[in-house]
């Protein structure tokens, strides 16, 4: 059963690790699909953080759009997939790294991870995607 707009947006606000899919830059390859942290607030854009020169960063820049899919298996099987165009790519800030890390890590791990990532991951960008196409389902009724 498809989710309502409110249900799918609420599910996307939860801290699931997403599967990001984007057209590969190599012509003879399937889409690049990788796990990624993301941030979303209902009615807004989805944003991700990645390396400026990472494979996914380059692929997203070339394609101009990408897809995220999040799912769960309990208490019911549910997924939400959202796809759309990139609306901005900007240099990442330490504050954004803290926000994203706080979403996924236990509070006592955030500072250490942020210090490590800020020093070791190289130049990062924040990519904003405007949700344009949604797919969703929950198998609660099955």
Regions found by a protein language model. Name each.
Residues 1-16, 76:
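Extreme N-terminal tail/first-helix region
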Residues 15-52, 60, 66-70, 79-82:
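Short beta-strand segments
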Residues 16-17, 65, 109, 134:
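Generic structural signal for secondary-structure transition and capping sites
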């Amino acid at each position: 059963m498809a989710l309502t707009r409110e249900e799918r947006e609420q599910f996307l606000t939860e801290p699931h690790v997403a599967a990001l899919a984007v057209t590969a830059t190599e012509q003879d390859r399937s889409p690049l699909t990788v796990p990624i942290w993301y941030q979303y607030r209902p009615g807004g854009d989805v944003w991700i953080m990645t390396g400026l020169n990472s494979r996914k960063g380059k692929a997203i820049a070339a394609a101009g759009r990408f897809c995220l899919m999040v799912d769960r298996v309990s208490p019911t099987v549910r997924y939400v997939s959202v796809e759309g165009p990139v609306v901005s790519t900007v240099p990442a800030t330490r504050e954004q790294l803290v926000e994203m890390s706080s979403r996924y890590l236990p509070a006592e791990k955030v500072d250490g991870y942020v210090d490590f990532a800020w020093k070791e991951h190289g130049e990062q960008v924040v990519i904003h995607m405007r949700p344009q196409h949604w797919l969703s389902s929950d198998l609660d009724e099955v």
